[in-house]
Amino acid sequence: IGPQRIICMTEETTEWLYLLGQEHRIVGISGYTVRPARARQEKPRISAFTSAKIDKILALQPDCVLGFSDLQADIASTLIRQGVQVTIFNQRSVAEILSMLYQVGAMVGQAQQAMERIAAMQAQMQAVALAAAALPRRPRVYFEEWDEPPISAIRWVSELMGIAGGDDCFPELAQQSLGKNRIIADSLDIVRRDPDIIIGSWCGKKFRPEKVAARDGWQNVKAVQHQQLFEIKSPDILQPGPA
């Protein structure tokens, strides 16, 4: 049932299809794929994030190409004009991520297994939220997706921080899907919001807490004073999928 020759232009659909035991359907993956590690050995890499090897994709004769967001619209348009079936997801929230997971599962005849795995994820998030509700206070959290210029948390990250018991310092920016619309032009805006915790995930670049702490005017930020600066690896938090 469903497509037999799938190309995954982003990492999360590759990871999900492997978890569902449907990796035999995958004929091409993103060059950024890290999970599962064996995917990089088993499958040809055909795309970055905003670029793809169109000729190589066409040569693989896919019956479905899976992509993510408006940033891959040009690639999708080119493939569609070549007669390729393309499905682009645009998940930005936790609910939309779970919906995407169900849709991909159903597409490959694994709706029941997808539902069971999604239910387990929901139960885990509910357990975390319940534990967080018992905390004495909700810390203010600044999540930095990039450092030059500073870019704050995308919506699903903001929501996950809330589930874990924190409050996003920039909740109004989290609603903006594009990174350019989450740029904080004046870094002193971050200082004024005085986060208790700073989490960095610099899109694959190593987070440098000492560099953040040394920024002009940041010495009085609570997170800096109390050394509450942490890194979450980008593949673990910035891929809108099962991770």
Regions inferred by a protein language model and the residue ranges of each:
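N-terminal ligand-binding lobe of clamshell/alpha-beta domains
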Residues: 1-243
